[in-house]
Amino acid sequence: MSPSIVFTGGGTAGHVTPNIALIKEFRKEGWNVEYIGSVSGIEKEMIEPLDIPFHGVSSGKLRRYFSLKNLLDPFKIVLGIIQSSLLFYKIKPDVVFSKGGFVAFPVVVGAWLNRIPVVAHESDMSPGLANRLSFPFVNKICLTFDAGKKYFKRQDKIEVTGTPIRQQLLTGNRMKGLELCGFNSSKPCLLVVGGSLGAGSINSCIRSALKQLTSEFQVIHLCGKGKLDSSLVGVEGYCQFEYANEELADLFAASSVVISRAGANSLYEILALGKPHILIPISSQVSRGDQIQNARYFQGLGISVVIQDELLKADVLLQALQDVMRKKDEIDNKIKALKIESATDKIVAIIKEQAHVQTPRIV
């Protein structure tokens, strides 16, 4: 009988894309693969093209701020644990891999209740709430940054591995990307990535500066689901998408510079592709500040140009783009010196190792 694995993680693309990289490796090796995500999260849409069984469970959002919805979330989480536990009793996988996000916690606990080993992964410099809560129930947690070790008590559970990178991103075709947008080679391309859910501040800034931007660049704008601007359809030198999946590799290949949020998964993919970039981390007012930490780290290495979200204006962005283009060769060399590699093989080895280990006592 073939070994089996269940993946979980969702809420945003950053909690799904590393899973996609790993899923493809396990399927190559003949493993049975299934996925547990939230009922209405983006993970279902992203996993669907892989043609693997997807199971939706209830999940609470684990908010860090007051909301009346917080009163219902504990009940949703308990329901998610029960649903996950019943699924695991039926599926009986050898191991579970969790990429975090609010759906992950009930799934991890459900696996623990069924004595199924769990490996988790944290991409950011400081762990998210789901991974902090999940830590007592996992066998191993893989970290992208060594700095993340200080947040966990049991150091024997920790492996610093880096981040899995989708290999298909490294094989994009520049001409296909240009054709997809109706562009040519007359100007460099600027790729704007606001995250899978979009980024209102980035979208507004790009559109307010569009005339100046298109005088220097051809602009590819990934603006998020439901965030397209119909008034800008047909504007020369501007192409907008809600989200890019299979096309993303070609869009990256066509681009000379990238504007992005500073989630660790997206950032590592940008670095693996060697793209000069501007990072606009999510404000600490609406997040735990993880993206700010990521951005500051690479800014300190002289690799990333960073604009704080609260300071984002058209003139600030245009000046930052000039700075990046002026220092492009220097930035290129610094990115190459990092030698960013995918952690897929390392993490696959850890998962296989844990697939033959009993689950830990809660500590």
UniProtKB/Swiss-Prot annotation:
Alphabetical keyword list: Cell cycle, Cell division, Cell inner membrane, Cell membrane, Cell shape, Cell wall biogenesis/degradation, Glycosyltransferase, Membrane, Peptidoglycan synthesis, Transferase
Membrane topology: Peripheral membrane protein
Primary location class: membrane
SUPFAM superfamilies noted in UniProt: UDP-Glycosyltransferase/glycogen phosphorylase
GO molecular function: UDP-N-acetyl-D-glucosamine:N-acetylmuramoyl-L-alanyl-D-glutamyl-meso-2,6-diaminopimelyl-D-alanyl-D-alanine-diphosphoundecaprenol 4-beta-N-acetylglucosaminlytransferase activity; undecaprenyldiphospho-muramoylpentapeptide beta-N-acetylglucosaminyltransferase activity
Pathway as given in its UniProt record: Cell wall biogenesis; peptidoglycan biosynthesis
A Gene Ontology cellular-component term: plasma membrane
Top-rank EC class of the record's enzyme: transferase
Catalytic activity: di-trans,octa-cis-undecaprenyl diphospho-N-acetyl-alpha-D-muramoyl-L-alanyl-D-glutamyl-meso-2,6-diaminopimeloyl-D-alanyl-D-alanine + UDP-N-acetyl-alpha-D-glucosamine = di-trans,octa-cis-undecaprenyl diphospho-[N-acetyl-alpha-D-glucosaminyl-(1->4)]-N-acetyl-alpha-D-muramoyl-L-alanyl-D-glutamyl-meso-2,6-diaminopimeloyl-D-alanyl-D-alanine + UDP + H(+)
Any Gene Ontology biological process: cell division
Family matches, as InterPro entries: GlcNAc_MurG, Glyco_trans_28_C, GlycoTrans_28_N
Annotated UDP-N-acetyl-alpha-D-glucosamine binding sites: 12-14, 166, 196, 291
EC annotation from Swiss-Prot or TrEMBL: 2.4.1.227
CDD domains: GT28_MurG (cd03785)
Pfam families: Glyco_tran_28_C, Glyco_transf_28
Location in the cell: Cell inner membrane
NCBIfam families hit by this protein: PRK12446.1
Family: Belongs to the glycosyltransferase 28 family. MurG subfamily.
Matches recorded under HAMAP family: MurG
Function: Cell wall formation. Catalyzes the transfer of a GlcNAc subunit on undecaprenyl-pyrophosphoryl-MurNAc-pentapeptide (lipid intermediate I) to form undecaprenyl-pyrophosphoryl-MurNAc-(pentapeptide)GlcNAc (lipid intermediate II).
Name of the molecule in the record: UDP-N-acetylglucosamine--N-acetylmuramyl-(pentapeptide) pyrophosphoryl-undecaprenol N-acetylglucosamine transferase
Gene of this entry: murG
